[in-house]
């Protein structure tokens, strides 16, 4: 009977493709928009992920997310170092600086200052120059995407000079740092150099980066730091979750994407449901003939549901495949649009498609179950 259901389904190619299109459209829109949303959320925490080898972030108690910098006094570093369980702690500067380029134009940049002695927080993807070059006077390293933005269609060249806060900065390296939510070029330099590049402030210490001693849980060290210093201390994963929660709760990004996803679900259900219902009405005599031959209602129900499942599988596969192709094209084209498709997106899309085909089939099931077998013998 399942084979009969399949042959009935593809008998009218136009209606079959119409049902598949409705499901595919919904799957494409849900998967694509959900992946773009996940990509945007990943951008908000990219700089936390890029700082490798750091177990604990210490900051002002009122900081809500990674870009919400509230400077600390430099003496807080020594207070953190004195907390039992802290293996080491270093300074870290994060801020926005305005750079004056060689041709006279200005550009906003994300300025990151690394500890002078250890260079903790330095990027891993340096492909021109080296991290050690940061120890040179006025030295900075820039991310590749930022270089392409400032000097588009120009070859990579070290030694470029620009100014920040009326101070000379020399480009000594390029790195493949992760893109950020703000999309500004990223500048890495030594902490002592960063505070000179930045606008003058009484307090300049953005974060204290620390690591627990071997065998001591990071969460326990965070509690000790908070208890003894009054500062906020979180692990790397806690800081990532805290930042994402802020953007989910305090911005309109989730609502905007949710509306688009809901629209795709409704439109997909409407197209698939209407087309599937018309398909059922067109084949009502065939279902009546099956009933006249003794086919039970349960078998008829199974046939309708199997048709819906087959449409769902095809529509889901094509829709998700097109969404993934869209993401691949974005990655290859160096687009500023972010795209990240974790397995959760595939599961959510699958559940949505299942609900769509279920709702679409429910519109037709009653029509099939109440059909009179005598319809076969009517003109």
Which ranges hold each PLM region?
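Hydrophobic secondary-structure segments that place a key small or acidic residue at a functional site
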Residues: 92-95, 102-117, 123-193
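C-terminal membrane-exit region of the final transmembrane helix in multipass inner-membrane proteins
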Residues: 3, 338, 342-379
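Peri-transmembrane interface segments
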Residues: 36, 44, 218-270, 278-284, ...
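Membrane-interface helix starts
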Residues: 9-25
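Hydrophobic, regular-secondary-structure patches
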Residues: 20, 24, 28-108, 128, ...
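Transmembrane alpha-helical interface segments in multi-pass membrane proteins
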Residues: 264, 277, 286-331, 348, ...
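Hydrophobic alpha-helical transmembrane segments
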Residues: 16-20, 313, 343-351
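A short beta-strand structural signal in non-transmembrane regions
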Residues: 56-59, 147, 174-175, 201-228, ...
